[in-house]
Amino acid sequence: MIKHALFATLLFGVSAVSSPTIPPQPLPFSVGEKVGYDVSVDNGKKVGDGTMWIEGPVDVRGTSTYLLRFDSRVRIAMLTGVSHSSSWFDPVRRLSLRFLKHEKNPLTHDDVSVDMYPDQKTWKSVDGQTGNSPDALPLDELSFIYFIRTLPLTPGATYQFDRHFDASRNPVVITVVRREVIPTPMGELKTVLVEMRVRDPKHYKGDGLIRFNLTDDECRLPARIESTMPIVGKAVLTMKSENASARCAKR
């Protein structure tokens, strides 16, 4: 149950934010990708499972999209929490057209259903809320994770984006921290640690911080995700299975 987080000019620098244009590179993910996770709490105890995968192609208002999915389920004692997120991602323009989220646990119940209209830089939810997006290439909290995988991951680089469809959630700041080797149920993996800071008063009472360890290969699989969840507090998702190319992650 990832709590967000959560991308056209890209911003990068070595020790500070700057703004040269980055030429588009081939996407490191495609339809059919699937990653399974163990969910554990701060003391290492396993409390649940999660899955990220890509379906499609799916048509949204005449545009062929990748359907990005994330599901998780956690349980501590008699308390159970579930989360389901879906994002319809245009792989050509690299933006989101639709986002759905359902979260339910003993503390909260949250449903989000939003359509984004990039050409108008607007969005509309099923409950009637509307808003203006600051960028014509909007993203949501799930598609942002996939977008991060497309960035140059040079340690020390910092990126700043105003691409969350909800203007109040911007800016989103991405910092590439370092390369490191992490243990997983699949063995030790070479990764790049990336931190994502996003405004999220609803879930974090301010800025939220999510840490990703992306595999240091052409697939950039999220091998480890550290965030905060209701019920469990700080939670860590660690990759236990994946179906990527043999040249990625299997070391």
Residue ranges of model-derived segments:
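Hydrophobic h-region of N-terminal signal peptides that target proteins for export
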Residues: 9-19
